[in-house]
Amino acid sequence: MSSMRTHYCGLVTEQLSGQEVALTGWVQRRRDHGGVIFIDLRDREGLVQVVCDPDRPEMFKAAEEIRNEYCIRITGKVRPRPAGTENTNLTSGKIEVLCYELTVLNPSVTPPFQLDDDNLSETTRLTHRVLDLRRPQMQYNLRLRYKVAMEVRKYLDAQGFIDIETPMLGKSTPEGARDYLVPSRVNPGHFFALPQSPQIFKQMLMVSGFDRYYQITKCFRDEDLRADRQPEFTQIDCETSFLTEQEIRDLFEDMMRTVFKNAIDVDLDAKFPVMEFREAMARFGSDKPDLRVKLEFTELTDVMKDVDFKVFSGPANSDNGRVVGLRVPGGGAISRGEIDAYTQFVGIYGAKGLAWVKVNEVAKGRDGLQSPIVKNLHDAAITEILKRTGAQDGDIIFFGADKAKVVNDAIGALRLKIGHSEFGKASGLFEDVWKPLWVVDFPMFEYDEEDARWVAMHHPFTSPKDEHMQYLETDPGKCIAKAYDMVLNGWEMGGGSVRIYRSDIQSKVFRALKINDEEARAKFGYLLDALQYGAPPHGGLAFGLDRIVTMMAGADSIRDVIAFPKTQRAQDLLTQAPSAVDEKQLRELHIRLRATEPKTTV
């Protein structure tokens, strides 16, 4: 391999017995057993046991002085371990290396934690990320990330895609998430924006005749962070010309099947199911449903319109209200304390409470139900609730009644919480498999009540369905987009659409978004001009590499599959970024800081 080492530690096996090897790595652990020193030597491939006998005094003295995380080099002979001392958990577990020479390449100060400590706080891990990355799970995660990226590249290369870089310094288009702005020193008062996606550039590449483009690139969004979000993230960005929506979906579905098979030996469905956005929201309250959870909403809005219970009848008679039931088979066993905990949980999503009915005996109707709300429901409503939900003896039905968004968010989250709970798994309400699907036919626009205007649900370059073009100027709320998301186990793995490729249609969409022609020309004139030069029909899709690897690795957060991530406050604890800069740098950029106004309290 090199003059310093002949093999990786974790790859030394019984096939090398009797051979002399040179190994380098870090001391995982050192044990002194009555005059014989054992060293667990670690590198990226794993561990090997090194034995140091005192009959080599100089080597043995060096072994006595080493400590955890010292970087060392050893030479020695591979030999079988004594019978009964084998370690079946290690690739090298049947052998050990009898050390001849030991050189300390670099000592280490005492680490702030043991690498095998599984109870570290994320703050500690991110502050000492260099050490955290030495841990076997983190080594595995980042190597898996590399493998996934390589499989993507191999697949797309075989399909004729060309890897083309697009600019990192671009024009700010304040639609959607906030841009990260970069001041221009040579153009005072002007700013670049870091890309939220290469969207417009890849469309212009289609106009330029590069009919199959991709890149694996960084994107940036200045938004509030969650477990699956980072201010900078990596996108597998793809665009094609002259393919239909179905052909685009088929192509990238096959890519994802291939990547999962080659990267982690998982066979995804031979054909992903397809679900309309409207159906996903009706059944699961989410446009990225986790199909592993075998619980669904039951629509009860119409049933509750005339009940003498304002908690239900109010939303049922409201234009933007919704009432649903969530039947949990066997849920009658859920305790009152657990119900109270669920009530508190849905409050996180804006729900004002959580009504419930335990079904003790269906045949008895009202008399077979246990709940404080039963007295507020008339017999016809009770009969219809039991019928629609398919309630059985021993079930519980939870209810959500509020604005549709609150109901979808709160009861949707409750569905997942129950399904993923120990009760849910023991009751067969959760299936531990890979469940991909396509969600299609998204609304083109959604109404922003605060700004009193329509906004693009995905982005303003998505094409409406051909038969819905007529609604752009008359009734934007009716427009359905040629948009599609690939969802896996409740995570959006990627999303895309067929794009608008005619300048006149793009202008109509801008007008529907209350972007007048003058503003559209100022912000997107270069795109509108490009579309006039015989732009081809085109569409594409972008996958979140971080999310894909997180799913494959079974990690809790995308921060576990990124080498140097930011916290949920968008800070890098290792380098202490972001940081203050000196006055000279600010003057060169023609920037003056304004003092933060103190918050006033009433």
From Swiss-Prot:
Binding site for ATP: R221, D222, E223, Q230, E492, G544, L545, D546, R547
Entry EC number(s): 6.1.1.23
InterPro entries (alphabetical): Aa-tRNA-synt_II, aa-tRNA-synth_II, aa-tRNA-synth_II/BPL/LPL, Asp-tRNA-ligase_1, Asp-tRNA-ligase_1_N, Asp/Asn-tRNA-synth_IIb, AspRS_core, GAD-like_sf
GO BP terms in the entry: aspartyl-tRNA aminoacylation
CDD domains: AspRS_core, EcAspRS_like_N
Family the UniProt entry places it in: Belongs to the class-II aminoacyl-tRNA synthetase family. Type 1 subfamily.
Catalytic activity: tRNA(Asx) + L-aspartate + ATP = L-aspartyl-tRNA(Asx) + AMP + diphosphate
Renumbered residue ranges of the record's region Aspartate: 199-202
Top-rank lineage group of the source organism: Bacteria
Xref: Pfam families: GAD (PF02938), tRNA-synt_2 (PF00152), tRNA_anti-codon (PF01336)
Chain positions of site Important for tRNA non-discrimination: H33, G84
Coiled coil: none
GO molecular function terms attached to this record: aspartate-tRNA ligase activity; aspartate-tRNA(Asn) ligase activity; ATP binding; nucleic acid binding
Record has Translocase as a keyword: no
GO CC annotations on file: cytoplasm
Residues annotated for L-aspartate binding in this entry: E175, R221, H458, R499
Locations listed in the record: Cytoplasm
Predominant cellular place of this UniProt entry's protein: cytoplasm
Keyword vocabulary terms for this entry: Aminoacyl-tRNA synthetase, ATP-binding, Cytoplasm, Ligase, Nucleotide-binding, Protein biosynthesis
Subunit composition and interactions: Homodimer.
Keyword Nucleotide-binding: yes
Described function: Aspartyl-tRNA synthetase with relaxed tRNA specificity since it is able to aspartylate not only its cognate tRNA(Asp) but also tRNA(Asn). Reaction proceeds in two steps: L-aspartate is first activated by ATP to form Asp-AMP and then transferred to the acceptor end of tRNA(Asp/Asn).
Protein name as it appears in the record: Aspartate--tRNA(Asp/Asn) ligase
